[in-house]
A protein has these predicted regions:
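Short amphipathic beta-strand/extended segments with alternating polar/hydrophobic composition
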Residues: 1, 46-50, 158-166
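Juxtamembrane "anchor/assembly" segments of surface/extracellular structural proteins
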Residues: 1-28, 65-71
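Short, ordered beta-strand-loop transition motifs
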Residues: 4-13, 51-60, 141-145
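Intrinsically disordered, low-complexity sequence elements enriched in Ser/Thr/Gly/Pro
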Residues: 6, 46, 149-151
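Surface-exposed or flexible loop/turn and strand-edge residues in extracellular/cell-surface modules
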Residues: 11-13, 44, 156
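Charged- and aromatic-enriched interaction segments used to assemble
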Residues: 59, 65-170
Length: 170
């Protein structure tokens, strides 16, 4: 079985359980990439294996993080800019090493964004005071090697949850 779990503006991980003597089990190694389809509406996403355990029942338990976690290893130099579009583009242009990710946003804001000390690209996006998420609000979507920062992810279908009508119990 394979389960992908994505938390809003948080973790994005894969858990795979398969027989230790399964068809491609020998190819599962830490650092390797698994391409998995997180949902019916999304394209397959790459996940890098970070942990493999073998419980007593002879099955491998593989844990992997979305490829976007590579952004933890890309350092961004200090800079300051106004606007969300300028902020996400500035992160890419001030990266200290090659950054294979593209960035995109639909957030229209003229707020100031500042990286005052060198920090990881992913922390600059969300995970520290003054991050893109902290400064502009919004929701991240990790789509392969594209970082999308939405004003609001998904759609509002104008459905109200009312106790006793469409909610019967807690």
């Amino acid at each position: 079985s394979c389960t992908v779990t994505e938390k809003r503006n948080g973790s994005y991980e894969l858990k795979l359980i398969c027989p230790a003597d399964g068809i491609h089990a020998e190819m599962l190694e830490e650092g390797h990439v698994i391409l998995a389809k997180p949902s019916d509406t999304m394209q397959s996403q790459p996940f890098r294996i970070y942990k493999i355990t073998t419980p007593i029942d002879g099955k491998l338990e593989v844990q992997a993080r979305h490829i976007s976690y590579q952004l933890n290893f890309i350092t961004v130099s200090p800079f300051s800019v106004s606007g969300c579009a300028g902020a996400v583009q500035g992160l890419k242009s001030h990266a200290a090493s090659d950054c294979p990710f593209s960035v995109w946003t639909d957030v229209a804001s003229s707020a100031m964004f500042t990286v005052s000390v060198p920090a990881s690209f992913r922390n600059c996006l969300g995970g520290m005071d003054g991050s893109v998420l902290d400064t502009f609000g919004g929701e991240f979507e990790w789509d392969r090697y594209t970082v999308k920062f939405h004003r609001a992810r998904g759609a509002d279908h104008n459905v109200h949850i009312v106790y006793g009508k469409n909610l019967t119990d807690f």
